[in-house]
Amino acid sequence: MRVYNFVLVIIFPLIFFRSLYKSLKFGENPKRIMEKFSFYGGKKSFKPVILIHAVSVGEVLASRKFVEEIKKRFPDHQTLITCTTQTGSETIKRLYGDSVLHQYMPFDLKFCIKRFLKNWKPEITFILETEIWPNLINLLHVQKRKVFLVNGRMSEKSFNRYKLVMPILDNVFSKLDFTICQGTKDLKRFIELGVNKDRVIKDYSFKFDSLSIPNERDNFENKGKKLIICASTHDPEEKILVKAFSMLNNENAILVLVPRHPERVSKIIKDIKKLGINPSLFSKNNLKIDLSNTINLIDEIGYLESLFSQANIAFIGGSLIPRGGQNFLEALKFSLPISSGESFYNFQEIAEDLIEMDILKVGNSAEKLKLIWEEQLNSVPNQIYEKTDNYLKQRMGASQRAFKHLSL
């Protein structure tokens, strides 16, 4: 780990100033950046601690059932949930309030991680998806504290990056006590990176369990309008989506843009206004869709599920650019026809399943999306309900099965 730590110290000023800039730019309390040096000013735990590390919103939402199960199985422990992003932090607070402890995960500098582990002394650590922090895992291993990677995934892009730096990571993957991954390709990649093949297993994604039951739609008066919910969009996807929408010959259609990071809203408004369009802001319309405007922009977090329940079709963002896509499952829960761009490597197996079931259509241009939306808007409502219902039910339960895999 010496070479890794040396390189990390060299590039750390860049990491720090980037983090500080984002904190100031998006209005976060600058004091919270001290948590990333493991200076924590909140309440401490007098109970044994179980640590769950979820990088951002997606992992936080996906782990809801898993967190509930931990609380049931370990009633004498305190749960500490860490993340690295402001939106992830806000989501943790909104979902759990004071029922869990929360702070940012410190930078993976050795002295920061040592201080963090000294403060909390986690009895068990669960790392979600792809959050491989070499010093965290190495020090937990040295201290003989259990560390598990759960709901793990490893895209081809991440795999190739890890292969390049493996010589300086001191076989970090072999130090995981057990790994539960989401797909066959993930399993093969983890083993190739050094995970012990006897301590890894494949199961379905926790995201299937995060879909709350019952599947009910909001009581929404759409007045004959058809909603296209474009979820978790990234720059510059909004411009492509607005262009596709402008080519639609459907006077009843409304485009609803839900950016992955709401702090980008002011820039999105400027970009859309350059196209001669003035969108309605969700926060300015009593947190409701403005049916009198053809383009709505959601500038609040926590409303995506409700919006999907009102939708006719859905587009999933992070896919028109090389970001690997976002979660398809919340849209699938409401049996919506789905579209996306061609970049969905973060959800490869799910995307391939949905394409085979003719639920997901893929287009990487405004012209292609326009044609897809025309077809989907004219489809029979709920015609895919049976397919989606069976697909989801067959894949639920991974959050509970994880504890059997881990013998906990």
What are these regions (language model features)?
Residues 1-408:
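Nucleotide-activated sugar donor-binding and catalytic core shared by glycosyltransferases
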